[in-house]
Structure formats: structure tokens, C-alpha cells
Amino acid sequence: MRFLYDSYSDIGKRDKNEDSFLVCEREGALIAAVADGLGGCRGGEVASAFAVDELKQRFEANAALDLGKALEEINSGLLLKQRELGMKMKTTICAVLINAEHTVAANIGDSRIYAFKDDRIVFQSTDHSVAQMCVDLGEITPEGIRTHEDRCILTRSLGSKQDIRADITVLDNSSYDSLLICSDGFWGGVVEQQMCSALEQSETPGEWLGTMRKLCGAEINSDNDNNTAVVINIKEG
């Protein structure tokens, strides 16, 4: 199994970039993550960088790590860092851990993981937000999340309390061929049909991401958010 991937992070029109990301290979496994520091709290960029740095260290020490447990430990570490620095810094995080047997997808907050098969979405992580709650209650459609007034109000984030747990989904490696991991600043500007169309028309991860980045750039003026994405293609052999 081979991994082909590309990534980027853009400040948008904000004063600073509070997004962080990770892509790392080791012993035939790959881990990738995107974290989006909460802008309403001091130290969002510190929180997101802390989360991905800690995750990378754990992966480098053990490529077969328990992703859910690792995120629980990172959450505890972030709470400790809050006390040390005197800042209530918080962050979203979504991550995938791919090995020969399967793929583990984990998310906390409203950064997203998409899995694609034959240019169609076969899996999408669920946001932890007030807008997603409205979807669950049947008050708005999933597409309505992008324009909902409470889209940025999260119901779960790293650093918000001690007993935070990620949503964990295990994917069979044969069930998908491509992955997209991104912050809300990215998926807010690129709708799902555009993701699929860009993938269908691309030969490489770089082409796929480049097309979507242009689409995101065309829409980003609406909220000026940081936007970050990692794309991965899985190849046999």
C-alpha cells in the first residue's frame, strides 16, 4: 500500500493562522490530522499546534497507537497547559490513522474527514456544533450548516473539559480510495459536489487539492477564515 498526499494551510484574511496540520508516515502506516484553534479564545494557535505536535510524537513512538486514547491524553495535556499559561485555549481536531488492516478516523469539533470511492463520498464525519444539532432535529438540511447563524458554536472541542472523547469510525481500506481532512474554513468554501468533481478531474493529489483551493479562495471573502486541508490517495502495491 502506497500513500500519495498533499496539503496546505492559508491564513485567509485573518490576522493570524490558528490552523495546524500533520502528515507523517512510519512503518507502513500514515497519520494525518487537521486542528483548528478556536478564534474566540486566547491561544487558539497554541492549542492547535500542541494537539498535532503531541499526536505526531505519539505516532513516531508507536505507529500502532490507539487514536482515541491518544486524543484523550492530548486533551488532558492541553488542560494542563491551559493552567500553566493562564489561557482557556481550545481546538478542534480530526485525524486518520491508516495501517495495513484498516483506517481509524477520529474527530472532535467541526473540522471534517471525507472518504471517497470512485469519486463519490462514502463517509463524512459529523460536526460537533449547534448547527449540526439543528440538522439532527430536522430543522435544517446538512447543506444549511454552511450558512447557519450558529455554525461556529461548538458542542465539543479539545480543551473544553476533562472527559472529551472523539467520535471514532473504523473504515475498511477497500471501502475508499481517497481522503480529505480539512478545517471549517475549507469546507465552508467548497461544497461536497465540488470536492467530487475536482477529484474526478484530477490525476494527482496536488491537482485535486489545487482545484479545491482555488474554489475555497473564491468563496473565502465571505468570512475570511483560515483554511487548511490534507488530501490522500491510497494505492495498492
What is the predicted function of each stretch?
Residues 1-237:
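PP2C/PPM-type serine/threonine phosphatase catalytic domain
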